[in-house]
A protein has these predicted regions:
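Active-site recognition of the HExxH zinc-binding catalytic motif
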Residues: 60, 76-84, 88, 146
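Extracytoplasmic and endomembrane cell-envelope/extracellular-matrix remodeling and assembly machinery
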Residues: 10-12, 132-311, 316-319, 343, ...
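Short pre-active-site segment immediately N-terminal to the catalytic Zn-binding motif
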Residues: 62-76, 136-141
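Hydrophobic or amphipathic, alpha-helical segments that drive membrane association/targeting
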Residues: 1-51, 174-180, 237, 253, ...
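Acidic/histidine metal-binding catalytic segments
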Residues: 36, 94-99, 121-123, 158-168
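Catalytic Zn2+-binding segment of zinc metalloproteases
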Residues: 72, 82-99
């Protein structure tokens, strides 16, 4: 994961990260995975791509959320990737290679991810070697097995059986629009007529049920739409039209939320807050909407209102990821660094592998003059991002300040050793 973070731009939206993690974990409960310790990386790229790799790594382009029109369509892709993981297709593919070294494994993983980010086939060149298309693609048998298992698990999790075929149709449409620049997801997951026909056949006879399509997904998808909107005013126009034509409360709420976010991105904070309150009037219990109001208060620099709301939300949703991250912003603005450090330290125990948590913990510790804590948190941040030498530098600076704390010194020495081992592992595959 650290190697991926060194090359991929992360989509650092706590609300989307939190939603996606819950969805992946839910799907994993219905999968054949025996080890469900997963790390989910959201990648800030508009193209459609997702991948799973040994070590429980699940990479998802934010563009997949942008393009998947329903939660079921997103679930169909994620279930497919979890099936690849549970059936060890990536590992088996490596075993079929003559060179089964870690270097080749990292090359293939990096190529899949990097090509999806750049949308450029040349990105498949890693170092001095080109990974062939045969190496990048799953075999036909692997794809069929992942389709079958992924479909079964997706349906068991409560999603519409037609979601897979609908997503295939979406991918076909996007592929036609992309012209010669074939979608990266289709490079590594070739979409054949047989796969489409099989997906349609599996869905037959499984109709007539109220399937999952949560409001939360629609809201999260609108976040991606606004995020990728280069001209906020155009997004405002689009969502205004959606509000006008919406016929149901759910669609009105969904579009109104998107409109509020678009107004905020366009720095129309009064309009943004008005529309977010309108959305909350329809569903006052939805947590994403409540957090959305908090976000907009912060964007509008209404810090008094933001602090009261953040404190209230965190008291009823302790250690909630997006609420904690937003509350810390409010506390940093207020100068209450001690409380900011407290809530982020608690969150770091729950999310020890989240670089964003360590980054902001280091920031607030620095402001609070906690120099040892600052260096330790920065060391963790750099370690998680694969900058091992920089991590060691901060650990040594922390150790210089802890000469009388033998327990902490021992902990720091262990972390330095951890970084040295990671450096040696990289050298062995270079």
């Amino acid at each position: 994961m650290a190697q991926l973070r060194r090359t991929l731009p992360e989509y650092t939206d706590p609300i989307t990260q939190d939603y996606t993690e819950h969805l992946v974990y839910r799907l994993s409960e219905f999968s054949e995975l025996t080890d469900r310790r997963l790390e989910i990386a959201l990648i800030d790229n508009k193209s459609v791509n997702a991948f799973a790799a040994p070590g429980g790594i699940v990479g998802i382009n934010a563009g997949l959320i942008f393009h998947a029109e329903t939660e079921g369509q997103l679930a169909s892709v994620l279930s497919h990737e979890l099936a690849h993981l549970s059936q060890r297709h990536f590992a088996r593919r490596m075993q079929r290679q003559k060179d089964r070294s870690l270097a080749n494994s990292l090359m293939i993983l990096g190529s899949i991810a990097l090509a999806g980010v750049t949308s450029n086939p040349n990105a498949l060149l890693v170092g001095q070697q080109a990974i062939t298309q045969q190496n990048l693609s799953f075999s036909r048998g692997d794809e069929q097995e992942a389709d079958r298992i992924g479909f079964k698990n997706m349906v068991a999790a409560g999603f519409d059986p037609k979601s897979t075929s609908y997503m295939f149709e979406k991918l076909q449409s996007l592929s036609r629009l992309s012209g010669s620049n074939e979608l990266e997801f289709l490079r590594s997951h070739p979409l054949t007529k047989n796969r489409i026909a099989d997906a349609q056949s599996r869905a037959q006879g499984l109709e007539g049920k109220n399937y999952r399509n949560s409001l939360d997904y629609d809201l999260v998808r609108n976040r991606s739409i606004v995020h990728f909107s280069e001209v906020p005013r155009q997004a405002v126009t689009v969502f205004k039209k959606e509000v006008e034509v919406a016929k149901t409360k759910k669609k009105i709420l969904d579009a109104t939320y998107g409109l509020a976010l678009a107004y905020s991105k366009d720095n129309k904070h009064s309009d943004a807050l008005e529309n977010m309150r309108n959305a909350l009037n329809i569903d006052s219990e939805n947590l994403i909407l409540q957090i959305g109001l908090l976000e907009l208060h912060i964007a509008a620099e209404n810090f008094f209102e933001a602090e009261a709301l953040a404190s209230s939300l965190l008291s009823t949703n302790p250690n909630n990821y997006p609420i904690t991250m937003l509350y810390n912003k409010v506390l940093m603005n207020k100068g209450d660094y001690e409380l900011g450090e407290k809530i982020l330290r608690e969150l770091s125990l729950i999310r020890p592998k989240d670089p964003e948590v360590w980054y902001w913990l280091a920031e607030v510790q620095g402001l609070d003059k906690n120099v040892i804590g600052l260096h330790l948190s920065r060391a963790e941040y750099f370690f998680l991002n694969g900058a091992y030498e920089t991590s060691i530098k901060h650990l040594r600076m922390a150790m210089d300040l802890t000469s009388n704390n033998f327990q902490l010194t021992e902990s720091i020495l262990n972390k330095i050793e951890r970084s040295h081992k990671s450096i040696e592992a990289l050298k062995s595959v270079s």
